[in-house]
Amino acid sequence: MHNMSDIIEQYIKRLFEESNEDVVEIQRANIAQRFDCVPSQLNYVIKTRFTNEHGYEIESKRGGGGYIRITKIENKDATGYINHLLQLIGPSISQQQAYYIIDGLLDKMLINEREAKMIHAVIDRETLSMDMVSRDIIRANILKRLLPVINYY
């Protein structure tokens, strides 16, 4: 059985499929009521599964009649998406942010499950056993070298 976050994520992705659009607009209260969950559960899904690293932009308006607008970032080809990711990676990157990037590559079928697991192993904090600042810098450098390879090979 999937957890509530997985169910909400699949529902939002289905909205994209059914609409054939690059934008989906949802209301927190309606989704929370539909899935009998608190609005913060929806916020968690949006913040962790519909990030820039996953290829989405979020616009949110709170209050009565508020909405969450989720837009698929338009990158019609792998090169555009890879370039977008390269711009997101600064001089350092946390393990979680790096995992979001890998998940996005997997979602867009630019890598397979095996490759994703190998990349996870290489950039994991256990592998990069050093102080956090150095670890995050090295992780960013690894990804910056790896992404063009994924794009061109």
Swiss-Prot record:
Entry annotated with the keyword Transcription regulation: yes
GO biological process, one term: regulation of DNA-templated transcription
Keywords, alphabetical: DNA-binding, Repressor, Stress response, Transcription, Transcription regulation
Keyword Calcium: no
Top-level taxon of origin: Bacteria
Record-linked Pfam families: CtsR, CtsR_C
Gene Ontology terms, MF aspect: DNA binding
Disulphide bonds in the chain: none
Family matches, as InterPro entries: CtsR, CtsR_C, CtsR_C_sf, CtsR_N, CtsR_N_sf
Family assignment from sequence similarity: Belongs to the CtsR family.
Role summary: Negative regulator of clpC, clpB and clpP transcription by binding directly and specifically to their promoter region.
Name of protein: Transcriptional regulator CtsR
Species whose genome carries this gene: Staphylococcus aureus (strain bovine RF122 / ET3-1)
